[in-house]
């Protein structure tokens, strides 16, 4: 229990009691809940701030600082138990996606993207879990279709053979959250594998992932890491876009941020936060790839939970390196 320092009979004013205690302890810094960049560290109301200032002697007023770093370090740090649970939760997320991207759920030519979205929602409820955001399922394909399959897409886009299907999905359990984007290919009649050009495109997305996570170094800021990753990716002829964020007690948590959709040069505040051990991230990014066979660009949009600890970076429960195949025959059949 936290010991109370206020005796109402001796000092009716809480603010005076707080001020007297601060003076008696003579701290060199007085951390308060204010922050320019992190909402989680910016909860002190203006009225309370004014009352605190008015109650303190002037020399102590000058010692007031933001306690932002303390709040962010606490919220971003994962315990060993949380790391073990996180792996299990991410595994459940992968399993739901794998089942959603199968003929158990999808009948090519009949099932639409919203059908899959709501199947995912219902699956989560059956498992007594929660989602922290509404899932999305979208399609990229040959012919005239939007490069940004997730932006302005028709809600009832029927999934067809030859489609590249993408989802963005995350669940919540025991205060932790996952955030995952994966890709599937719908086999055409007679096909047993995805086209080589799509498999090569996925490899480009994986290479951008490596360019980012291979440069995770303790003490390096998100903006520094982002700059290196983009430079290395472009040197390999890739077209990257990185928007990786902290993950844990919140889906978009506080901590080191590596780019945003509209901030590929760096992010003020959270991008300047250094990388610490025992922290988790949604490794979220995409690689734009021109597909000759489709005469258009596509985006390989990927997102996987990652952990940075004393041994370096690792994926919490693996990452996608092969396309999920929708319509694949059972292995016992020839």
Model-derived features: where do they sit?
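Active-site neighborhoods and metal-handling regions in enzymes and metal-associated proteins
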Residues: 1-334
């Amino acid at each position: 229990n936290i010991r109370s320092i206020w005796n109402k009979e001796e000092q009716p004013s809480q603010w005076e009691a707080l001020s007297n205690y601060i003076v008696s302890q003579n701290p060199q810094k007085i951390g308060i809940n204010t922050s320019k960049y992190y909402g989680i560290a910016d909860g002190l109301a203006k009225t309370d701030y004014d009352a605190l200032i008015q109650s303190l002697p002037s020399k102590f007023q000058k010692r007031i600082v933001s306690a932002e770093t303390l709040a962010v370090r606490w919220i971003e740090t994962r315990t060993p138990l949380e790391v073990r649970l996180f792996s299990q939760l991410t595994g459940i997320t992968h399993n739901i996606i794998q089942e959603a991207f199968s003929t158990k759920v999808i009948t090519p030519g009949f099932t639409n993207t919203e059908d899959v979205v709501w199947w995912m929602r219902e699956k989560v409820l059956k498992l007594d879990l929660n989602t922290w955001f509404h899932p999305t399922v979208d399609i990229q394909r040959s012919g005239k279709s939007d490069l940004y399959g997730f932006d302005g897409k028709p809600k009832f886009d029927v999934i067809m053979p030859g489609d590249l299907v993408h989802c963005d999905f995350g669940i919540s359990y025991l205060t932790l959250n996952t955030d995952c984007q994966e890709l599937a290919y719908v086999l055409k009649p007679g096909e047993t594998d995805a086209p080589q050009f799509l498999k090569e495109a996925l490899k480009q997305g994986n290479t951008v992932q490596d360019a980012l996570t291979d440069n995770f170094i303790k003490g390096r800021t998100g903006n520094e890491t982002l700059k290196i990753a983009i430079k290395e990716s472009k040197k390999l002829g890739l077209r990257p876009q990185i928007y990786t964020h902290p993950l844990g007690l919140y889906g978009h948590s506080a901590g080191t941020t590596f780019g945003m959709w509209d901030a590929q040069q760096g992010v003020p505040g959270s991008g300047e936060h250094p990388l610490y051990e025992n922290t988790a991230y949604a490794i979220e990014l995409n690689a734009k790839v021109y597909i000759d066979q489709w005469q258009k660009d596509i985006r390989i949009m990927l997102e996987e939970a990652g952990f940075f600890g004393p041994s370096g970076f690792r994926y919490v429960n693996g990452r996608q390196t092969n396309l999920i195949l929708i319509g694949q025959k059972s292995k016992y059949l020839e």
